[in-house]
Amino acid sequence: MDVYQISCDLRPGVRDAEFVTALNAYLGSLKKTGRIETWRLLRRKLGLGIPALGEFQILIETRDLAQLDEAFKAVSTRNEPVEGAHHGVNSLVTNFQAALYRDFPDPHRQLGEERF
């Protein structure tokens, strides 16, 4: 699995429940149409964490980069209904950062022949 990780904070005045509702609508639609496998929302607890990483973490899982690319293509059309759902989330957040991770070790990896 590949994991697209998003870190963000809420814009001033945005309620956390409003953010959750918008995120459910947006990522729920991507999951329902098979563009992502699953997603999770995490929130910093007890104020612990690296401030630069934001209060919220969104973990979006895809089977592989091909599925993630299809999700990006769907969103980048800027057509409804995905555009409205994407804007519904994007307009609520600030300090957006993203990263891409994979399960490790890779399931196809062979051990013993590495040269480094």
Task: Report residues per predicted region.
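Active-site-flanking beta-strand signature of metal-NTP-handling nucleotidyl enzymes
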Residues: 2-9
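Short amphipathic alpha-helical segments
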Residues: 14-41
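Hydrophobic pocket/interface hotspot
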Residues: 6, 19, 23, 58, ...
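Short, charged, intrinsically disordered terminal tails
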Residues: 109-115
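Structural beta->alpha junctions
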Residues: 10-13, 63-64
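An amphipathic, aromatic/His-enriched active-site/gating alpha helix that lines ligand/cofactor pockets
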Residues: 29-37, 51-55, 59-104, 115
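Short, solvent-exposed loop/turn elements at beta->coil junctions and helix N-caps
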Residues: 42-48
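Short, flexible turn/loop "capping" segments at secondary-structure junctions
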Residues: 1-2, 49-52
